[in-house]
UniProtKB/Swiss-Prot annotation:
A GO CC annotation given for this chain: membrane
Main function: May be involved in spermatogenesis.
GO terms of molecular function: ubiquitin-protein transferase activity; zinc ion binding
One annotated GO biological process: protein autoubiquitination
Major subcellular location class: membrane
Protein name: RING finger protein 141
Organism: Homo sapiens (Human)
Amino acid sequence: MGQQISDQTQLVINKLPEKVAKHVTLVRESGSLTYEEFLGRVAELNDVTAKVASGQEKHLLFEVQPGSDSSAFWKVVVRVVCTKINKSSGIVEASRIMNLYQFIQLYKDITSQAAGVLAQSSTSEEPDENSSSVTSCQASLWMGRVKQLTDEEECCICMDGRADLILPCAHSFCQKCIDKWSDRHRNCPICRLQMTGANESWVVSDAPTEDDMANYILNMADEAGQPHRP
């Protein structure tokens, strides 16, 4: 029975426009993700980015922000910190903080693209020259994707208007949609998280920055999530 329901749901998703289907898939994935699987993905990103950037002077470090995963509602409040570190000096050059939804998007992008980069590098007869060229090209594509995810964040309701507001649960909406919803409801339209007060119900989201963008794979995460100071 459960498999039948799952198959029917997937059939419906397959008929949706690509943009909406991807959003639905990410929401479903974050909803079914266990805490152990989440930690496994954080560790996997550290491993994958270390392999891809093994010949570069900088590397990424993904960590769960201390205390953000201690609540029973960890999926709502958990934050993942991504730090770019210079290997030789140990200096932190950039740091970003992401919610669970943003982290899952970044995870899927990095792992899918890195698989191709690593496979091509392993079959190359001249890794020194070809590997460098492939990584540089791939990095540009990844950074473009991250910029798109952050600069053009869309409303979770209409999937059309640009997101103007973000709730404490990290779901974002355009002003038009959330105005209609908030006239009758005091909770999030997506996860139903209850808003406790008018002053903290709708929070204006900060525009993402483009600090320290470079031309290689390590900068893919610089624009994911929001700026973070350790």
